[in-house]
Amino acid sequence: MSLKGLEQAIENLNSISKTAVPRASAQAVNRVANRAVSRSVAVVSKDTRVPRKLVKQRARVKRATVNKPRALIRVNRGNLPAIKLGTASVRLSRRKRDKKGANSVLRIGPFRFPGGFIQQLKNGRWHVMRRTSKPRYPIEVVSIPLAAPLTTAFKEELPKLMESDMPKELRASLTNQLRLILTR
């Protein structure tokens, strides 16, 4: 169906039903938005080696409706705390000169955090911490930065999908709406 055919189908649908075209466009937008999320999540997961499930939790799609035919993708771009990656295990250094477990490495999944330790914070949460310097309190929560990879992945994937998949999805949902109306 060319662009002329698409316009003709839209006119035909509008003459039969007022809600068919907005419903079809909302369906197409939602499909493309969900596909953009899943593709971007896959790219970020591959780049950062963070499990896909943890990255996908950070993207939410507010679906398009008949009245508002635009989908909103909200992404939590904050750093991912290392404790979320899975069960932590400390690989103790067994060398004689390393007293009291010095030079031990904390491992969580495929990640290694040298000098990392687990501690419960004042708010009751457990986190992986790391010393930043020698004095008493300078410690920080160990986290994996996701802001840059998430931003670049979504900025690259969305325009590509709008260009390639949106016309196909719109065509499919319009023909489906036409089929539903004609079989009534």
UniProtKB/Swiss-Prot annotation:
Does the record's keyword annotation contain Kinase?
no
Keywords recorded for this protein, A-Z: Host cytoplasm, Late protein, Viral tail protein, Virion
Q: Which domain of life is it from?
A: Viruses
Localization per record: Virion; Host cytoplasm
Write out the GO cellular component annotations.
Answer: host cell cytoplasm; virus tail
Query: What disulfide bonds does the UniProt entry report for this chain?
Result: none
What does the protein in this record do? Stabilizes the tail structure and acts as a connector between the end of tail and the portal vertex of the capsid.
Per the record, the similarity remark reads: Belongs to the Lambdalikevirus tail completion protein family.
Q: Know the name of this protein?
A: Tail completion protein
Q: Which organism is it from?
A: Escherichia phage N15
